[in-house]
Design a protein with these regions (language model features):
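Acyl-group handoff/entry surfaces in thioester-processing enzymes
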Residues: 2-76, 81-173
Length: 173
């Protein structure tokens, strides 16, 4: 789309992290990292945008859909720090993830990290390049991720089929 072309140009002209969208979710209580990882894998399967990279063909950016590839959830444990330092350090780790430059051609343009403060407190960071997602879409992805996690935790069947409406369907409107 024209908007994505502008973001591609601006990404190349700047430091590269200005258009990273980050969302940080505090999780309290029992958290199963393996279920988060399974939920992320289903999101990547269902949403083509999360498997898309941007290549250059004859000087023009083009989207490339990559095949699904399972990945491991990145985890950081800061539980050894003094309790009063953990929340601030967790936010610093999440912001650092948000500020890392995405390589548009190599991808992926979507990354997550689970930061463990103690056995019942976590900060979950989701970062995606704005070329693939807007704020509204980020909220939808978060809701779907939480729903998938609940379904896995409750032993319910999970829909792994591609989402009926993809991000490019909205961009085309």
């Amino acid at each position: 789309s024209p908007g994505q072309r502008r973001l591609w140009f601006l990404h190349r002209a700047g430091s590269g992290s200005e258009y990273n969208m980050g969302s940080f979710l505090w999780l309290r209580g029992h958290v199963e990292p393996t279920l988060i990882n399974q939920s992320l894998d289903v999101l990547r399967q269902r949403h083509a945008a999360l498997r898309t990279t941007i290549s250059v063909l004859d000087g023009t950016p083009v989207q490339r859909l990559r095949p699904f590839c399972a990945t491991e959830l990145a985890m950081v444990d800061i539980g050894a720090l003094p309790r009063e330092q953990r929340a601030q350090r967790a936010l610093a780790v999440a912001r650092s993830l948000r500020n890392q430059r995405f390589e548009l051609e190599g991808g992926p343009l979507f990354r997550c990290q689970l930061i463990r403060l103690d056995s019942n407190e976590f900060l979950f960071a989701i970062v995606i390049h704005h070329i693939l997602c807007d704020g509204w879409s980020m909220e939808i992805l978060q809701r779907e991720l939480l729903s998938l996690y609940s379904q896995f935790a409750d032993g319910l069947p999970v829909n792994r089929l591609p989402a009926a409406v993809q991000f490019h369907d909205y961009v085309a409107m």
